[in-house]
A protein has these predicted regions:
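Extended effector regions of multi-domain proteins
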Residues: 2, 6, 10-84, 90, ...
Length: 316
């Protein structure tokens, strides 16, 4: 096993964690909270009136850093003035290294210093999002753009339209990103409607991602089957807290998202949980040695129909 270590920060809250032996450890000043400037919130220039308006953006940052083995992981949540919520993982620390003879093949790694081979590897995060958008009765909708064939309705060949598909049950809810179609997922409350007719909602906008490089019969894939899909949706269950099941490092596979969705519970107008998988393939480079600059991955939650207009218009 590998124990998880956290280190104090300023302006922070305490946290209890379970170590590799199952004991509760109390850490002081672990979860950091601060506000920071974030450039431009919105801007427009009215050319005819020769007038510009601009507002500064600020965000509340809730963060913590953890050390697991040779890696250091920062988990950052950003809360923006317009209702946007962003998650960002910061990956740093040191590479997993092995000694290498001069001229030896580096097939499974990369030469990062004389006699030092940095091993190729992957990282996976699964973020459990217990959504309650204006209440617990939520529905997940997959949205992507569809191109319209050139013809009478599209004479210039530049038209496209959104296509929405309700995710009705758990087996249908193992989904993957499709950046070529701008795919995202809305979580809406169909009993809450604004004056424009929009259901109150938030949309999950994925960032860059990868598919697992492991073979399907590998021990890793048996234990971590959740990496097979970028998004899973399940009905809320208080006992389902971790995507690979309760004891990922001590089992030979089985419990976890691939098994849970076989219940095929309905997902429309109910309490839903989204599980977003994020993967990073790390091909080491000399610049990663001896300590790695931060690599960033994450996703964004944006309000869609939750407000009736830009909620930051009253900022001075």
């Amino acid at each position: 096993h590998r124990d998880l270590h956290s280190f104090p920060t300023r302006r922070s809250s305490d946290l209890d964690q379970v170590d590799g032996h199952g004991n509760v450890r109390h850490f002081s000043k672990i979860v950091c909270m601060h506000e920071e400037d974030y450039g431009i919130l919105w801007k427009h220039t009215d050319v005819g009136a020769d007038h510009s308006e601009i507002r500064r953006s600020r965000r509340l940052v809730v963060s913590s850093f953890f050390t697991i083995g040779n890696y250091d992981y920062g988990l950052f949540w950003y809360l923006y003035l317009d209702g946007t919520i962003e998650f960002e993982a910061k990956l740093t620390g040191t590479l997993y290294l092995r000694a290498i003879h001069e001229g030896e093949e580096t097939q499974y790694g990369a030469l990062v210093a004389p006699g030092v081979n940095g091993m190729i590897h992957e990282h996976y995060f699964n973020i459990r999002l217990d959504m309650s958008v204006d209440g617990d009765d939520n529905t997940v909708v997959e949205v992507e753009a569809k191109r319209i064939p050139t013809g009478p309705e599209n004479p210039y060949g530049n038209a496209h339209t959104p296509v929405e598909t309700i995710i009705n049950s758990e087996i249908d809810a193992a989904r993957d990103i499709a950046p070529q179609n701008g795919r995202f997922w809305k979580i809406i409350n169909r009993s809450r409607t604004n004056t424009l007719g929009w259901h109150a909602g938030y949309k999950l906008m994925p960032g860059p991602n990868i598919k697992p490089m492991h073979q399907p019969d590998s021990p890793f894939m048996r234990r971590a089957g959740f990496v097979n899909h970028d998004l899973w949706v399940t009905a809320y269950d208080p006992d389902q807290l971790h995507a690979p099941g309760q004891y990922v490092s001590q089992n030979e596979g089985g419990p976890g998202l691939p098994e849970w969705i076989l219940e095929n519970r309905p997902l429309v107008d109910t309490d839903v949980v989204l599980w977003h998988t994020i993967g990073v393939l790390h091909l080491p480079r000399p610049e990663d040695f001896p300590v790695m600059p931060v690599e960033y991955v994450g996703f964004t939650l944006k309000p869609v129909g939750f407000f009736e207009r830009n909620p930051t218009l009253d900022l001075a």
